[in-house]
Amino acid sequence: MRRIAVMGAAGRMGKTLVEAVQLRSPLSGLTAAIVRPGSSLVGADAGELASLGRLGVPMSDSLEKVVDEFDVLIDFTLPEVMLKNLAFCRKAGKAMVIGTTGLGAREKQLLAEAGKEIPIVFAANFSVGVNLSLKLLDMAARVLGDDADIEIIEAHHRHKIDAPSGTALRMGEVIASALGRDLQQVAVYGREGHTGARERETIGFATVRGGDVVGDHTVLFATEGERLEITHKASSRMTFAKGAVRAALWLDGREAGLYDMQDVLDLR
């Protein structure tokens, strides 16, 4: 059995991850659940908090306290929290599955350095459908080339704090790479006022925030006479959680390295 720890186990995504781990039993089992230091939930049963019944896994407020109880840590927390956990797991030799978004160049460099010592799966989105979409986007960009104007539209719930979403940015990176472009040079984030005619090589991003939208992404390839749209809509966080657990199981026995869901799904 793969012993899995969930960071932020009291949050919305954390509870879903706890449930997803148990759904893969006996291949995986929740053996540690971590909440923020000082939380009133320390000692509470992780299964009961996730409405699964008692699992016998008490909430802890420290990785140090449960270091001998897990093989891989699943972490969807904020960047500053994830980086502390990364440093701990790197020192302790623990594998990680990371779904944190909003990372900058420095944070990604730290991930790359840690990947030289421990196995890590890092992805902006763990949905199987989204990762299949990335493969389709690469194909579409290569076929349509410079003939298409490309726009990426994403929508999420009102509580999401980063924009564009990590998934939208990853989609942009895949498309830009296929076209031999640098996303940082060609990305346009929103438009307002008298913008002038659209420059052919730009990749546009539009963001919508509202309600309880789990995550919608559409990429528009607009050419003269026709449009191609590739859309993915998530209706439940469970799709991300199941993908993360799949990644955790895939890491079993892997050598150190920085992997993503394209590796897990053999889509390279």
UniProtKB/Swiss-Prot annotation:
Gene Ontology annotations of biological process type: diaminopimelate biosynthetic process; lysine biosynthetic process via diaminopimelate
Binding locations of (S)-2,3,4,5-tetrahydrodipicolinate: H157, G166, T167
Binding positions for NAD(+) per the UniProt entry: G8, A9, A10, G11, R12, M13, G99, T100, T101, A123, A124, N125, F126
Any one GO molecular function term: NAD binding
Family assignment from sequence similarity: Belongs to the DapB family.
InterPro entries: DapB_C (IPR022663), DapB_N (IPR000846), DapB_N_CS (IPR022664), DHDPR_bac (IPR023940), NAD(P)-bd_dom_sf (IPR036291)
Pathway: Amino-acid biosynthesis; L-lysine biosynthesis via DAP pathway; (S)-tetrahydrodipicolinate from L-aspartate: step 4/4
Active site annotation, chain numbering: H156 (proton donor/acceptor), K160 (proton donor)
GO CC aspect terms: cytosol
Organism expressing this protein natively: Pseudomonas fluorescens (strain ATCC BAA-477 / NRRL B-23932 / Pf-5)
Reactions the enzyme catalyzes: (S)-2,3,4,5-tetrahydrodipicolinate + NAD(+) + H2O = (2S,4S)-4-hydroxy-2,3,4,5-tetrahydrodipicolinate + NADH + H(+); (S)-2,3,4,5-tetrahydrodipicolinate + NADP(+) + H2O = (2S,4S)-4-hydroxy-2,3,4,5-tetrahydrodipicolinate + NADPH + H(+)
UniProt keyword annotation of rRNA-binding present: no
Locations listed in the record: Cytoplasm
This protein's name: 4-hydroxy-tetrahydrodipicolinate reductase
Cysteines engaged in disulfide bonds, as pairs: none
Any one Pfam family match given in the protein's UniProt record, by short name: DapB_C
Designated gene of the protein: dapB
Record-listed NADP(+) binding positions: R36
HAMAP family: DapB
EC number of this enzyme: 1.17.1.8
Keyword Oxidoreductase: yes
Broad enzyme group: oxidoreductase
Function: Catalyzes the conversion of 4-hydroxy-tetrahydrodipicolinate (HTPA) to tetrahydrodipicolinate.
Keyword list, A-Z: Amino-acid biosynthesis, Cytoplasm, Diaminopimelate biosynthesis, Lysine biosynthesis, NAD, NADP, Oxidoreductase
